[in-house]
């Protein structure tokens, strides 16, 4: 049998089993665990290549072949790090394996035909589009920024650049919910909107869920009282939606213990669990140790650097409508910034104790930096804590799977939409991000929504080829016309769908139903299910997990930073 060197093979068809790649300029290295393609039968498009009539391309009609094929790609997902061809049909992933022409090739499980378009995945990394569960819908342009960072699903709330939305992720009431659903119908991104859960009687909550909300948000700026928490969770259990909470920083309605008592063992998604973004000061970080709580971070504190503390005070004053001339407002802001808990947050992520990463877009966080900051934290933790259990000097596969789950499958599980998005798996929407390894986590090579290209770096439009400078991200055809309705999804509760909200509002996007999110627990959080016993020293703010102090130094330098943004 003829053989070629590993280097020559990688240059032609991309790396294979046992090959290693560095992620961007980090100290993280992946190793390909399995190659689903067949040596000697690989398919590749181009002049003199395999995907031609009678060779890699069969004679079947469109109904019998995939619409889009990604060839020889390296998949990073919670379930593995593998090389495979990926088949897409009707906007969904239908195959992960070996593509080709079954008439002349063995082991083919993805059929290429005349109706198949090809995306060259050789040497590229493939990830699922990110799911950001902490979006303040302050401006519609966030969708573009999120997409070009690799995020394809927004969950949050708001109505535009007004005080309520600048501070809270809430779309309150039927009228606001309906107008925002009509608005986001035009965005080329998946969307779910939170209703307001800050009310002590059930009727005003039920009507928001029936109006099309994906779930509910409790926020201290609207009142995160024990009664509101108890009532909101009662309705959520009844109607199978998730509740997200930004708890009571000032401890006015009760302390951390009262909030836990009101939650009463029911599932709830706690935002910015460290506390700088809000929540019981200083105890909210203890929620990492509750088996029914799904803990999340927002990206302004991630990872802990020498600049993190200094930049937070001004951000807080703006986001929460505070007045620097009022001493009580300044004290409120200062109570939330604790370098000790910020340092502990990085370590809790690395231990798999904090399960989700999100942005807090334009409300302290940066909508386009969820992916980047996740991997910066992983890099920092490898340098400071060494390899994770199960990893070797050769690869960081376990750490990579842990961190990618934080912004893909786990937020999807938390909000009952993992049957539609959150991973590269058969049957799910083909929301797929392609990366050159050198630019992984920073600048995608291609962003696909529902199997179509939504955004891509594109050169001079008047050039003879696509690559001449200036190159920048531009919207592609999945963003245009009626195509955007067939490639993006609006998520809402079963109650909203049964009430006919999509039909009443004339929504044209795909409609996704929330399901099963009241059964999710911390144990459901893939690679991030650790439930430590958390202690916090109230004077020093030192955090302990199972008796071990969580202490680390701030980073003075990070990868995936200035060298990628010179132009």
Swiss-Prot record:
SUPFAM superfamilies: Composite domain of metallo-dependent hydrolases, Metallo-dependent hydrolases. The modification N6-carboxylysine is found at residue 217. One of its GO terms (biological process) is urea catabolic process. It comes from Proteus hauseri. It is an enzyme of class 3 (hydrolase). The active site is at residue 320. GO terms for cellular component: cytoplasm. Residues 129-567 form the Urease domain. This is Urease subunit alpha. It is found in: Cytoplasm. Its cofactor is Ni cation. Binds 2 nickel ions per subunit. NCBIfam families: PRK13206.1 (NF009685), PRK13207.1 (NF009686), urease_alph (TIGR01792). Belongs to the metallo-dependent hydrolases superfamily. Urease alpha subunit family. Ni(2+) 1 binds at residues 134, 136, 217, 360. Substrate binds at residue 219. Its EC number is 3.5.1.5. InterPro entries: Amidohydro-rel, Metal-dep_hydrolase_composite, Metal_Hydrolase, Urease_alpha_N_dom, Urease_alpha_subunit, Urease_AS, Urease_asu, Urease_asu_c. Its main location: cytoplasm. The keyword Ribonucleoprotein does not apply. Carboxylation allows a single lysine to coordinate two nickel ions.
């Amino acid at each position: 049998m003829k053989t070629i060197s590993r280097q020559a093979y990688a240059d032609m068809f991309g790396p294979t089993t046992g090959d290693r790649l560095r992620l961007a300029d980090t100290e993280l290295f992946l190793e390909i665990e399995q190659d689903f393609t067949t040596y000697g039968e690989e398919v590749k498009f181009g002049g003199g290549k395999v995907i031609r009539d009678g060779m890699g391309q069969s004679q079947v009609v469109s109904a019998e072949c995939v619409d889009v094929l990604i060839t020889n790609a390296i998949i990073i997902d919670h379930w593995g790090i593998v090389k495979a061809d990926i088949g897409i049909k009707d906007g969904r992933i239908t195959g992960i394996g070996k593509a080709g022409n079954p008439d002349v090739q063995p082991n083919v499980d993805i059929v290429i035909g005349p109706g198949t378009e090809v995306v060259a995945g050789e040497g590229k990394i493939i990830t699922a589009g990110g799911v950001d569960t902490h979006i303040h819908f302050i401006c519609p342009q966030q969708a573009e920024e999120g997409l070009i960072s690799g995020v394809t699903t927004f969950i949050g709330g708001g109505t535009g650049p007004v005080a309520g939305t600048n501070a809270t992720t809430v779309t309150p009431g039927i009228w606001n919910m309906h107008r925002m659903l009509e608005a986001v119908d035009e965005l080329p991104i998946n969307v779910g909107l939170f209703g307001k859960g800050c009310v002590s009687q059930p009727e005003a909550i039920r009507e928001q869920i029936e109006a099309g909300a994906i779930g509910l948000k409790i926020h201290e700026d609207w009142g995160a009282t024990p009664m509101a928490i108890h009532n909101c969770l009662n309705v959520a259990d009844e109607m199978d939606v998730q509740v997200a909470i930004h708890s009571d920083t000032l401890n006015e309605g009760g302390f951390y213990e009262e909030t836990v008592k009101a939650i009463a063992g029911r599932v709830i998604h706690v935002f910015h669990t460290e506390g700088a973004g809000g929540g019981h000061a200083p105890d909210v970080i203890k929620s990492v140790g509750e088996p029914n709580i799904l803990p999340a971070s927002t990206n302004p504190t991630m990872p802990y650097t020498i600049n993190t503390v200094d930049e937070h005070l001004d951000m807080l004053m703006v986001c929460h409508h505070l007045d620097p001339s009022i001493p009580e407002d300044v004290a409120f802001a200062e109570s939330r910034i604790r370098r000790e808990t910020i340092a502990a947050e990085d370590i809790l992520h690395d231990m798999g104790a904090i399960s989700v990463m999100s942005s807090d877009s334009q409300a302290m966080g940066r909508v386009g930096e969820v992916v980047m900051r996740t991997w910066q934290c992983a890099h920092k933790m490898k340098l400071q804590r060494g390899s994770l259990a199960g990893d070797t000097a050769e690869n960081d596969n376990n750490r990579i799977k842990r961190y990618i789950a934080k912004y893909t499958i786990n937020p999807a599980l938390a909000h009952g939409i993992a049957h539609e998005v959150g991973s590269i798996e058969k049957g799910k929407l083909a929301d797929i991000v392609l990366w050159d390894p050198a630019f992984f986590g920073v600048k995608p090579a291609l962003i696909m929504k529902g199997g179509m290209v939504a955004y891509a770096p594109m050169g001079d439009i008047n050039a003879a080829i696509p690559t001449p400078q200036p190159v920048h991200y531009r919207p592609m055809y999945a963003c245009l016309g009626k195509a955007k309705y067939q490639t993006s999804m609006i998520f809402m509760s079963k109650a909203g769908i049964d009430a006919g909200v999509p039909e009443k509002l004339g929504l044209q996007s795909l409609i996704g139903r929330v399901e099963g999110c009241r059964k999710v627990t911390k144990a459901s959080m893939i690679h991030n299910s650790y439930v430590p016993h958390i202690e916090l020293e109230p004077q020093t703010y030192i955090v302990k997990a199972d008796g071990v102090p969580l202490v680390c130094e701030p980073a003075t330098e990070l990868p995936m930073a200035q060298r990628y943004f010179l132009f």
